[in-house]
Design a protein with these regions (language model features):
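PRPP-associated nucleotide enzymes
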Residues: 1-212
């Protein structure tokens, strides 16, 4: 697993807003959008491109365009908070949706939605989830995406736990793990007894969408 922690003062400032328990939803969502923009920007740095020729008002010059249409896959529900930023940077991307609910006793995910293209071969795939905690949800999604032909997947997370990174390394086939990239704003200290990331930022889904 290739880990890239985005080290940038603006990313650190946005992450600070997200961590602060006093941040209300109307400030949390814009801060997440800003940070997701920076994370996706870094995550797409190695996107394959192809040369094109364009004509400016003055001359003909060389340019580039994407070699294949990307696929972004937010993990519902928290990953939806990162989707607008991803689509703003990748307007031609296809969107897959994976809905998971966490069992609060076992901390294991149960899928309730898997709207994913049948053939992902040749498409750069970006899995969006603010929290990489135990790695259980990410592993479920990654196995699904791999079964549909995806290779060289990139996980885009706000914060990751060391336990989650270890789970990805050990829970995937060696070749898939070697091709996997994780882009995050921070790797935090640990998981607590209820499998929440410490210091983390709480329940990202609740902080984005509220809890009635």
């Amino acid at each position: 697993v290739h880990l890239h922690v985005v080290d940038h003062p603006l990313a650190a400032m946005a992450l600070t807003v997200l961590r602060d328990e006093r941040t209300p939803r109307d400030r949390f969502r814009p801060a997440l959008h800003d940070l997701a923009t920076m994370l996706v920007y870094e995550a797409t740095r190695a996107l394959p491109v192809m040369p094109v020729t364009v004509t400016t008002p003055l001359a003909t010059t060389a340019g580039t365009r994407l070699a294949a249409e990307p696929v972004v896959a937010p993990v519902l529900r928290a990953g939806l908070g990162m989707l607008p930023a991803a689509l703003a940077l990748l307007p031609t991307a296809h969107t897959a949706f994976i809905g998971l609910a966490r069992d609060e006793t076992t901390h294991q995910p149960t899928a309730y939605l898997e709207s994913v293209p049948d053939d992902l071969a040749g498409h750069p795939v970006f899995l969006l989830d603010p929290m990489l905690a135990t790695g259980g949800s990410a592993l479920h999604c990654l196995r699904l995406l791999l079964d549909r032909g995806a290779r060289g997947i990139t996980v885009v997370a706000v914060v990751a736990a060391p336990e989650g990174l270890v789970a990805l390394e050990s829970g995937l086939p060696a070749d898939a793990a070697a091709e996997l990239t994780v882009v995050a704003a921070a790797v935090d200290e640990r998981l607590n007894d209820t499998a929440y990331i410490v210091p983390g930022l709480g329940d990202a889904g609740d902080r984005i969408f509220g809890l009635m």
